[in-house]
Amino acid sequence: MFELARENAPCVLFIDEIDALGASRSDMKQSSGRHLINQFLQELDGINNSNEGILILGATNTPWNLDPAFRRPGRFDRIVFVPPPDEMGREAILRLKLKDKPVEAIDYRSIAKKAEHFSGADIDALIDIAIELKLEASFADGLPKPINTNDLVTALKKHKPSTQEWFITAKNFAMFANDAGLYDDILTYMKIKK
């Protein structure tokens, strides 16, 4: 991966779920995992090759599980909190996701407002539930039916935002394991004072 990035520099190397690769070595029972992390850190540091012209970004839902060595200067030394989409963002996601679906009379703004704290994945789930409802109705009388606002409102009653559980965990880390201020943005978003 690093070799390919170096061959194509300048480039951005984005690693999703970086915690799967950069979990705390002290939590690992097998040495193979520690060796993998050590190798990754050497590549990240450009020990044997230059990483000039490569911007390396990582994403995780659990930054508190990253090995502290990953957060040293020159590595993944900045944590940027990306909150769930706001109302306008949710409306835009709804419009985008429903663009090629059979719909009629959707009040996107109303649904976006009611879908507070929904992530993009939650909005996908919401739409899937609405589609399932329409499929069931279509099987009953054999006629295809477009998705409407009521279908999405019904789907909202069946799906809760997945971010709620994450915020409970994040709040605990931000309140009680935040000496360096890495999670202050989470507290600000949640309107909690330290």
Model-derived segments and spans:
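Walker A/P-loop NTP-binding motif of AAA+ ATPase domains
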Residues: 1-114, 118, 130
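C-terminal engagement/docking regions of AAA+ P-loop ATPases
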Residues: 57, 113-125, 135-194
